[in-house]
Amino acid sequence: MKQSKVNVSFEFFPPKNEEAISSLWQNINRLEPLKPRFISVTYGAGGSTRENTHNLVKQIKKKTDLQPAAHLTCINSTKKEIELIANDYWSSGIRHIVALRGDPPKNISSAKGDFKYATDLISFLRKKYDFEITVSAYPEIHPDSDSIEQEYDILKKKIDLGATKAITQFFFDVEYYFKFIDGAVKRGIKIPIIPGILPVTNCKRTIEFAKKMNCKMPIKLKNMF
């Protein structure tokens, strides 16, 4: 029986120092033979981290045969700032953006800039560029959402504005993913929804992150830590 090919992508944090840069490129070179569908690079809140993201995405495009996807958050950003970044990516041959809101201040109404939600960013990008736009999805409901129905409504709005695929928040129980996919199909959502998988390298940090993002960790798994 012929096995179907499983396509994967990898997500990296931008390196913060020379040692991390060396380690990152070792990993990229090690993973390149697997021919991932794309390599994405996260986007931090600080200015220096953002520059690291921009530089790394462009270096991946220049030095490898991999297809990089640049995370781009919009909270506290102006249209001019986003336009400059998008223009730079486009002129560098980058054609894939992971469009996200980013972590807002505690009071979302106090956020500065021209964007409050990822949908604002998607709309802005789609009107000006022909990027492939990937967005987030939340099988276990985003901490700011009221219900799973709201999650589907937001995802459908992202698609209507130009999103071409989605990546889910990480999860530990695959049933949440399957249930989310079933619900998406019933609601006419047809874009690919890629499962987010988090390698556990730091148990304490993983548990804290899971709690923050409303990801339920099975007791059996938690006891292993």
Task: Label every PLM stretch briefly.
Residues M1-V41:
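Conserved N-terminal beta1-alpha1 strand-loop-helix module at the mouth
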Residues E19, G113, Y117-Y138, G188-F225:
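Active-site pocket-lining/capping segments in soluble small-molecule metabolic enzymes
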Residues V6-P14, R37-V41, P68-L72, I97-A99, ...:
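Hydrophobic faces of well-ordered beta-strands that scaffold small-molecule active sites
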